[in-house]
């Protein structure tokens, strides 16, 4: 989308300055904006400034958080960010301490190290929930992995 960062985040919604800047900070975008020529009014996209994959992921997350929905489906929101930004996003958005702390959050991830932070964990296999664990039963990612059935091996075609 060729538009300013702000327009990309607002996505047609009313501008709430305080909440907007809270979201940018929680999504670890404020440091990036300090380096951009027009801060959040910089045009990004094909006809504007190119942004990195990590910045795109954080922009998409900011747009989602700014929507103020009651339910959030986050598809691997931590995959394109480094460990420091990952921790920042967990603390400031996803976990109970974050902006979405009082919302229902469904998060897909391949990051086993965050599993102990979840209050429920479900493994989906072939479109069905194959394992569901409540946190009191999960103490480490290793214990969860031990409870998760291994996928069947694909037949050798050679």
Protein language model regions, located:
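H-loop (His-switch) and adjacent beta-strand-loop-beta switch element
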Residues: 110-111, 117-134
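ABC-fold ATPase nucleotide-binding domain signature/coupling loops
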Residues: 30-59, 77, 81, 145, ...
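ABC ATPase nucleotide-binding domain helical subdomain, centered on the C-loop/LSGGQ "ABC signature"
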Residues: 6-45, 68, 89-93
């Amino acid at each position: 989308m060729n538009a300013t960062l702000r327009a990309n985040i607002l996505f047609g919604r009313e501008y709430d300055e305080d909440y907007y800047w809270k979201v940018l900070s929680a999504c670890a975008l404020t440091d990036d904006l300090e380096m951009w020529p027009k801060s959040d009014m910089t045009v990004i996209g094909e006809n504007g400034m190119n942004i990195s994959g990590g910045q795109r992921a954080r922009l998409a997350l900011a747009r989602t958080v700014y929507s103020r929905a009651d339910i959030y489906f986050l598809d691997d929101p931590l995959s394109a960010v480094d460990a420091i930004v990952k921790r920042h996003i967990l603390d400031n958005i996803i976990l109970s301490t974050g902006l979405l702390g009082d919302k229902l959050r469904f998060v897909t991830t391949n990051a086993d190290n965050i599993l102990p932070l979840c209050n429920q964990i479900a493994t989906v296999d072939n479109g069905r929930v194959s394992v569901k664990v409540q946190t009191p039963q999960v103490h480490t990612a290793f214990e969860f992995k031990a409870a998760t059935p291994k996928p069947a091996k694909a037949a050798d075609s050679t």
